[in-house]
Amino acid sequence: MTATPDAPAATSDAPFDLVVRGEQTLTTAGIVAREIGIRDGRIVAIEPLGSGLTGAEVIELADDQVMIPGLVDTHVHVNEPGRTEWEGFDSATRAAAAGGVTTLIDMPLNSIPPTGDVDALNAKRQAATGKLHIDVGFWGGAIPGNTADLRGLHDDGVFGFKCFLLHSGVDEFPHLDADEMEKDMAVLAGFDSMMIVHAEDSRAIDRAPSAEGNKYERFLKSRPRGAENVAIAEVIERARWTGVRAHILHLSSSDALPMLATAKRDGVRITVETCPHYLTLLAEEIPNGATAFKCCPPIREASNRELLWQGLLDGTIDCVVSDHSPSTAELKQLDVGDFQTAWGGVSSIQVAFTAVW
């Protein structure tokens, strides 16, 4: 039995508030048959199915239903305050709960103001008050001119700091160049915080072909793997020099996996995420004009997808997160289908887990 230290032990004369029984329960032992006892809102017992736990309420799961621990999604754009027409905390956390996510960490941009100082963090917390259906935490932003604000945000509870190495897509969250990123990394290393990086190189993107028009192949060429690879190499070396904890966001280019694996072996404190859309969708199958699929970095080819799966299985990629980034339908320009001007983002928190299950 697994029990919290202050929880009463399970006994036959002390039924649980809720017992859930299922043939498929995801545990550290794999998918096994278990029954779960819950008291005062906390799981206090995990026993083999048939152990006879009793409860005021009992839920028997169907054979094809799976009981899982609550998921943690560390890459979510909620957009409140400031852009609630895109989405807000009420809708985002309801969708998360429907998708099995019980904790999300909100990104520092797309809200107005972005989370670049303590006042902005407090504004976001105030906006979230009374609207949350799951647990929520916050990332801070690392942007030009806010180095002096990083320690205050850390002390006030942010989990780390996000920066971009190219235009973020919104003017109020400007990007850092590699030297500015390194300067902030050195500051963060002083209190063991983390720099999380949207790693696409601005110069490489500027030199790539335009994405204008409705051809997905053209959009793919506008965000080449090389732009990711160059930026990731910068993050690795700057993390190596400063000793900071660094994290690569939404890895799309499988070309970067060997250098990331080498950096990990070398002791660089770097972790990597990818997303369900990179693991399940294929560039070859995205119709021209289907801007619902536009995200940056982009969904790539079948050969790339298979290598991402290998990177996940061998531990080079540490986690899978949604990068949930909603907008209005008008911004996705579904009727126009222009990949240059459509908003780049996939709204997926409700379906992310089932997509890769």
What are these regions (language model features)?
Residues 2-69:
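Histidine-rich, glycine-flanked metal-binding segment
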Residues 23, 41, 64, 75, ...:
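Divalent metal-coordination and catalytic microenvironments
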Residues 65-127, 131:
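Metal-associated gating/positioning segment near the N- to mid-region
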Residues 81, 107-133, 138-146, 165-171, ...:
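Active-site loop-to-helix "anion-binding N-cap" substructures in soluble metabolic enzymes
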Residues 101-103, 134, 159, 318:
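Short acidic/polar active-site loop segments enriched in Thr and Asp
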Residues 109, 292-294, 337-342:
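Short beta-alpha connecting loops at secondary-structure transitions
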Residues 118-134, 181-197, 351-355:
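Alpha-helix-loop-beta-strand connector modules within alpha/beta enzyme cores
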Residues 148-163, 167-320:
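Histidine/acidic residue-rich metal-binding segments in metalloenzymes
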